[in-house]
């Protein structure tokens, strides 16, 4: 059904939770393709033991290069990009499939809704050790946001042909900040107008575990927000904030396909 690509950096405890949730809570058969950055914590041995395909660099390739490598191994028509600190809710794939079937073409970008560190505030733990899976499974259906416009976040699903057409993630965004809205801009330019965040497709998000883990490590670059914003601005001629407001209408309620922006006074002077 889906080829699920996941970047990971010495984060085996969370990767295991993520993979087990996919196996346990899916209706269909998927392939899981992590990209292992460094992986000196036993990650590659774990993946081989579980007969999972993966890509590997001995250095920190981070999100863009790593996901482009993993996507080359995808055998299914749809590529789902996820983080290794996600726990997938039950029937997530059935929910996504219904959305894909309703659209009936390939020009779309569908994403999920993040619980805990994301759109929905439901605390079921902030670590692998204190994650209350039972609480999440009992309460996630009653914790809701809404279907929303203009998501630029994982987990997201696009057709493999569309991924290949735009070249996947742009690798100049090292280690990754800014690459999500950049991908959306490339999709916009080839005619994608459905950028839908789906309330019922939920993942529990522990919250940028790797960024927190390596924040003070001078050898591991994990966050370059200002650099990513600058690259986007120089590349596209406007900021990420501007793109999300005037093009994607991010976080407003989903009302259907987006239209070209209304180039009024606010567009030019705000």
Short names for language-model regions:
Residues 79:
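Short aromatic/hydrophobic "clamp" motif used to bind/position activated sugar donors
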Residues 90-128:
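Conserved donor NDP-sugar-binding/catalytic core segment of glycosyltransferases
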